[in-house]
Amino acid sequence: SLKIEYSLCKHQSTKLWNLLNSEPYINTLGSLSGNHAVQHAKAGLKAIYLSGWQVAADANSAGEMYPDQSLYPYDSAPKLVESMNNALIRADQIQHMEIIDGDMKKENKVDYMLPIIADGEAGFGGPLNVFELAKKFIKAGAAGVHFEDQLASEKKCGHMGGKVLVPTGTMIKNLKAARLAADIANVPLIILARTDANAAKLITNDHDDNDKPFLTGERSPEGFYYVKAGIDQAISRGLAYAPYSDLIWCETATPNLEEAKKFADAIHKKFPGKLLAYNCSPSFNWKKHLSDDEIASF
Protein backbone atom coordinates (compact mmCIF):
# COMPACT_ATOMS: atom_id res chain seq x y z
CA SER A 1 0.00 0.00 0.00
CA LEU A 2 1.01 3.64 -0.38
CA LYS A 3 3.34 4.91 2.30
CA ILE A 4 2.39 8.43 3.40
CA GLU A 5 5.07 10.65 4.90
CA TYR A 6 4.08 13.13 7.61
CA SER A 7 7.20 15.24 7.24
CA LEU A 8 5.98 18.30 9.17
CA CYS A 9 4.98 16.28 12.24
CA LYS A 10 8.23 14.31 12.05
CA HIS A 11 10.37 17.44 11.78
CA GLN A 12 8.55 19.38 14.50
CA SER A 13 8.37 16.43 16.91
CA THR A 14 12.10 15.86 16.55
CA LYS A 15 12.74 19.57 17.05
CA LEU A 16 10.62 19.64 20.22
CA TRP A 17 12.34 16.55 21.61
CA ASN A 18 15.76 18.09 21.01
CA LEU A 19 14.67 21.33 22.69
CA LEU A 20 13.31 19.47 25.70
CA ASN A 21 16.58 17.62 26.10
CA SER A 22 18.90 20.59 25.58
CA GLU A 23 17.19 23.47 27.43
CA PRO A 24 16.58 23.83 31.19
CA TYR A 25 12.90 24.29 30.37
CA ILE A 26 10.69 25.35 27.47
CA ASN A 27 8.20 28.10 28.24
CA THR A 28 5.13 28.34 26.01
CA LEU A 29 2.05 30.53 25.78
CA GLY A 30 -1.38 29.64 24.44
CA SER A 31 -1.90 30.72 20.84
CA LEU A 32 -5.37 31.35 19.44
CA SER A 33 -4.71 31.81 15.72
CA GLY A 34 -2.09 31.60 13.00
CA ASN A 35 -1.28 35.30 13.34
CA HIS A 36 -0.99 34.86 17.09
CA ALA A 37 1.51 32.04 16.52
CA VAL A 38 3.58 34.25 14.21
CA GLN A 39 3.70 36.96 16.90
CA HIS A 40 4.88 34.38 19.44
CA ALA A 41 7.71 33.43 17.10
CA LYS A 42 8.68 37.09 16.67
CA ALA A 43 8.67 37.47 20.46
CA GLY A 44 11.33 34.77 20.74
CA LEU A 45 9.34 31.83 22.09
CA LYS A 46 10.70 28.40 21.22
CA ALA A 47 7.42 26.48 21.19
CA ILE A 48 3.68 27.15 21.00
CA TYR A 49 0.88 25.77 23.14
CA LEU A 50 -2.61 25.18 21.80
CA SER A 51 -5.08 25.16 24.69
CA GLY A 52 -8.38 23.31 24.71
CA TRP A 53 -10.09 26.05 26.68
CA GLN A 54 -9.06 28.56 24.02
CA VAL A 55 -10.48 26.27 21.33
CA ALA A 56 -13.68 25.94 23.36
CA ALA A 57 -13.99 29.67 23.90
CA ASP A 58 -13.12 31.12 20.52
CA ALA A 59 -11.55 28.78 17.98
CA ASN A 60 -13.80 25.78 17.40
CA SER A 61 -15.39 24.62 14.15
CA ALA A 62 -18.89 24.98 15.64
CA GLY A 63 -18.43 28.74 15.87
CA GLU A 64 -19.66 28.68 19.46
CA MET A 65 -18.36 30.02 22.76
CA TYR A 66 -18.20 27.01 25.07
CA PRO A 67 -16.96 26.43 28.62
CA ASP A 68 -13.88 24.22 29.01
CA GLN A 69 -15.76 20.92 28.99
CA SER A 70 -14.89 19.30 25.62
CA LEU A 71 -18.20 20.36 24.08
CA TYR A 72 -16.70 21.45 20.76
CA PRO A 73 -16.28 19.20 17.67
CA TYR A 74 -13.29 16.94 18.22
CA ASP A 75 -11.51 17.98 15.02
CA SER A 76 -11.41 21.66 16.06
CA ALA A 77 -7.95 21.56 17.65
CA PRO A 78 -6.28 19.67 14.77
CA LYS A 79 -7.76 22.21 12.35
CA LEU A 80 -6.30 25.03 14.44
CA VAL A 81 -2.90 23.30 14.46
CA GLU A 82 -3.05 23.15 10.67
CA SER A 83 -4.00 26.83 10.47
CA MET A 84 -1.15 27.83 12.78
CA ASN A 85 1.38 25.78 10.84
CA ASN A 86 0.20 27.30 7.56
CA ALA A 87 0.72 30.78 9.00
CA LEU A 88 4.16 29.90 10.34
CA ILE A 89 5.19 28.36 7.02
CA ARG A 90 4.00 31.45 5.13
CA ALA A 91 5.90 33.76 7.49
CA ASP A 92 9.01 31.62 7.00
CA GLN A 93 8.62 31.76 3.20
CA ILE A 94 8.23 35.55 3.20
CA GLN A 95 11.29 35.91 5.39
CA HIS A 96 13.28 33.62 3.08
CA MET A 97 12.46 35.80 0.07
CA GLU A 98 13.29 39.00 1.98
CA ILE A 99 16.73 37.59 2.80
CA ILE A 100 17.33 36.53 -0.83
CA ASP A 101 16.22 39.96 -2.09
CA GLY A 102 18.50 41.72 0.39
CA ASP A 103 15.64 43.35 2.29
CA MET A 104 16.58 41.53 5.48
CA LYS A 105 19.88 40.53 7.04
CA LYS A 106 20.37 36.81 7.64
CA GLU A 107 21.50 37.42 11.23
CA ASN A 108 18.06 38.90 11.98
CA LYS A 109 16.29 35.75 10.87
CA VAL A 110 13.37 34.61 13.04
CA ASP A 111 12.73 30.92 13.68
CA TYR A 112 9.08 30.75 12.67
CA MET A 113 8.85 26.97 12.60
CA LEU A 114 7.99 26.56 16.26
CA PRO A 115 6.77 23.14 17.41
CA ILE A 116 3.14 23.11 18.57
CA ILE A 117 2.02 21.21 21.67
CA ALA A 118 -1.73 20.61 21.41
CA ASP A 119 -4.44 19.82 23.93
CA GLY A 120 -6.06 16.44 23.25
CA GLU A 121 -8.42 16.89 26.22
CA ALA A 122 -9.61 13.51 27.56
CA GLY A 123 -9.54 12.06 24.06
CA PHE A 124 -13.25 12.61 23.30
CA GLY A 125 -14.01 8.96 24.11
CA GLY A 126 -12.06 5.73 24.45
CA PRO A 127 -8.90 4.32 22.82
CA LEU A 128 -10.38 4.33 19.30
CA ASN A 129 -11.31 8.01 19.63
CA VAL A 130 -7.84 8.82 20.97
CA PHE A 131 -6.27 6.95 18.05
CA GLU A 132 -8.28 8.91 15.48
CA LEU A 133 -7.65 12.22 17.23
CA ALA A 134 -3.90 11.54 17.36
CA LYS A 135 -3.98 10.77 13.62
CA LYS A 136 -5.57 14.15 12.93
CA PHE A 137 -2.96 15.95 15.03
CA ILE A 138 -0.21 14.10 13.16
CA LYS A 139 -1.67 15.08 9.78
CA ALA A 140 -1.91 18.70 10.97
CA GLY A 141 1.78 18.74 11.92
CA ALA A 142 1.56 18.85 15.72
CA ALA A 143 4.81 18.19 17.58
CA GLY A 144 3.19 17.03 20.80
CA VAL A 145 -0.23 16.20 22.21
CA HIS A 146 -1.36 15.79 25.80
CA PHE A 147 -4.18 13.61 27.06
CA GLU A 148 -5.71 13.68 30.54
CA ASP A 149 -7.18 10.96 32.73
CA GLN A 150 -10.66 12.43 33.12
CA LEU A 151 -13.83 10.74 31.90
CA ALA A 152 -14.42 12.41 28.53
CA SER A 153 -18.20 12.68 28.91
CA GLU A 154 -17.80 14.45 32.28
CA LYS A 155 -14.71 16.46 31.34
CA LYS A 156 -14.15 19.63 33.39
CA CYS A 157 -11.62 22.42 33.33
CA GLY A 158 -8.65 21.35 35.44
CA HIS A 159 -9.52 23.95 38.07
CA MET A 160 -13.21 23.08 38.43
CA GLY A 161 -14.88 20.69 40.83
CA GLY A 162 -16.70 17.52 39.83
CA LYS A 163 -13.87 15.93 37.87
CA VAL A 164 -14.30 12.19 37.28
CA LEU A 165 -11.25 10.00 36.70
CA VAL A 166 -11.09 6.97 34.45
CA PRO A 167 -9.27 3.95 35.92
CA THR A 168 -5.49 4.04 35.65
CA GLY A 169 -5.53 1.14 33.20
CA THR A 170 -8.01 2.92 30.95
CA MET A 171 -5.75 5.94 30.71
CA ILE A 172 -2.82 3.67 29.84
CA LYS A 173 -4.90 2.19 27.00
CA ASN A 174 -5.51 5.72 25.71
CA LEU A 175 -1.80 6.52 25.84
CA LYS A 176 -1.04 3.30 23.97
CA ALA A 177 -3.62 4.23 21.33
CA ALA A 178 -1.94 7.59 20.76
CA ARG A 179 1.46 5.91 20.50
CA LEU A 180 0.08 3.35 18.06
CA ALA A 181 -1.17 6.15 15.82
CA ALA A 182 2.28 7.73 15.89
CA ASP A 183 4.05 4.43 15.22
CA ILE A 184 1.82 3.62 12.26
CA ALA A 185 2.48 7.09 10.85
CA ASN A 186 6.22 6.61 11.55
CA VAL A 187 6.54 9.87 13.47
CA PRO A 188 8.12 10.56 16.90
CA LEU A 189 5.06 12.45 18.18
CA ILE A 190 5.67 13.70 21.73
CA ILE A 191 2.95 12.31 24.01
CA LEU A 192 2.22 13.99 27.33
CA ALA A 193 0.21 12.24 30.04
CA ARG A 194 -1.72 14.63 32.27
CA THR A 195 -3.25 13.49 35.54
CA ASP A 196 -6.05 15.38 37.27
CA ALA A 197 -5.91 13.07 40.29
CA ASN A 198 -4.57 15.79 42.61
CA ALA A 199 -8.03 17.37 42.81
CA ALA A 200 -10.41 14.74 41.39
CA LYS A 201 -12.66 13.08 43.97
CA LEU A 202 -14.57 10.70 41.72
CA ILE A 203 -13.73 7.68 39.57
CA THR A 204 -15.88 5.65 37.20
CA ASN A 205 -15.35 2.24 38.85
CA ASP A 206 -13.42 0.39 41.55
CA HIS A 207 -11.79 -2.48 39.64
CA ASP A 208 -8.24 -1.14 39.05
CA ASP A 209 -5.65 -2.28 41.60
CA ASN A 210 -3.70 0.97 41.23
CA ASP A 211 -6.78 2.96 42.26
CA LYS A 212 -7.97 0.77 45.15
CA PRO A 213 -5.78 2.40 47.87
CA PHE A 214 -7.58 5.71 47.26
CA LEU A 215 -11.19 4.48 47.29
CA THR A 216 -13.31 5.72 50.21
CA GLY A 217 -16.05 3.10 49.85
CA GLU A 218 -18.68 5.73 49.11
CA ARG A 219 -20.72 6.24 45.94
CA SER A 220 -22.06 9.39 44.31
CA PRO A 221 -25.70 9.86 43.22
CA GLU A 222 -24.52 9.24 39.63
CA GLY A 223 -23.00 5.90 40.63
CA PHE A 224 -19.36 7.01 40.57
CA TYR A 225 -16.94 6.01 43.32
CA TYR A 226 -15.39 8.55 45.67
CA VAL A 227 -11.59 8.63 45.94
CA LYS A 228 -9.16 10.50 48.16
CA ALA A 229 -7.88 13.36 46.03
CA GLY A 230 -4.35 14.60 46.59
CA ILE A 231 -0.75 14.51 45.49
CA ASP A 232 -0.31 10.86 46.51
CA GLN A 233 -3.05 9.78 44.12
CA ALA A 234 -1.46 11.93 41.40
CA ILE A 235 1.96 10.40 42.04
CA SER A 236 0.52 6.89 41.84
CA ARG A 237 -0.89 7.65 38.42
CA GLY A 238 2.17 9.53 37.21
CA LEU A 239 4.32 6.50 37.98
CA ALA A 240 1.88 4.25 36.11
CA TYR A 241 1.83 6.52 33.05
CA ALA A 242 5.59 7.10 32.87
CA PRO A 243 6.44 4.07 30.67
CA TYR A 244 3.79 5.09 28.14
CA SER A 245 4.46 8.81 27.76
CA ASP A 246 7.31 11.19 26.98
CA LEU A 247 6.32 13.79 29.58
CA ILE A 248 4.11 13.73 32.66
CA TRP A 249 1.96 16.64 33.78
CA CYS A 250 0.36 16.89 37.22
CA GLU A 251 -2.51 19.37 37.15
CA THR A 252 -2.63 21.44 40.35
CA ALA A 253 -5.35 23.66 41.79
CA THR A 254 -2.91 26.41 42.80
CA PRO A 255 0.67 27.44 41.85
CA ASN A 256 2.28 25.20 44.46
CA LEU A 257 6.03 24.59 44.28
CA GLU A 258 6.00 22.17 47.22
CA GLU A 259 3.49 19.92 45.47
CA ALA A 260 5.41 20.19 42.22
CA LYS A 261 8.66 19.18 43.93
CA LYS A 262 7.04 16.26 45.76
CA PHE A 263 5.57 15.00 42.50
CA ALA A 264 8.84 15.46 40.59
CA ASP A 265 10.93 13.77 43.28
CA ALA A 266 8.61 10.76 43.40
CA ILE A 267 8.64 10.32 39.62
CA HIS A 268 12.40 10.79 39.32
CA LYS A 269 13.09 8.32 42.13
CA LYS A 270 11.73 5.53 39.92
CA PHE A 271 12.26 7.14 36.50
CA PRO A 272 15.42 9.30 36.69
CA GLY A 273 15.43 12.13 34.18
CA LYS A 274 11.79 11.70 33.20
CA LEU A 275 10.57 14.89 31.56
CA LEU A 276 7.79 16.77 33.34
CA ALA A 277 5.36 19.56 32.44
CA TYR A 278 3.65 22.18 34.60
CA ASN A 279 0.62 24.35 33.94
CA CYS A 280 1.35 28.00 34.77
CA SER A 281 -2.33 28.71 34.35
CA PRO A 282 -3.96 32.14 34.03
CA SER A 283 -6.81 30.59 36.03
CA PHE A 284 -4.60 30.61 39.14
CA ASN A 285 -4.92 33.41 41.67
CA TRP A 286 -1.17 33.97 41.68
CA LYS A 287 -1.20 36.96 44.05
CA LYS A 288 -3.13 35.02 46.67
CA HIS A 289 -0.54 32.26 46.92
CA LEU A 290 2.80 33.83 46.00
CA SER A 291 4.76 37.04 46.46
CA ASP A 292 5.82 39.14 43.48
CA ASP A 293 9.37 37.78 43.75
CA GLU A 294 8.11 34.19 43.86
CA ILE A 295 5.90 34.81 40.83
CA ALA A 296 8.83 36.33 38.92
CA SER A 297 11.02 33.28 39.56
CA PHE A 298 8.33 30.59 39.31
Language-model regions: role of each:
Residues S1-F298:
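Alpha/beta enzyme core
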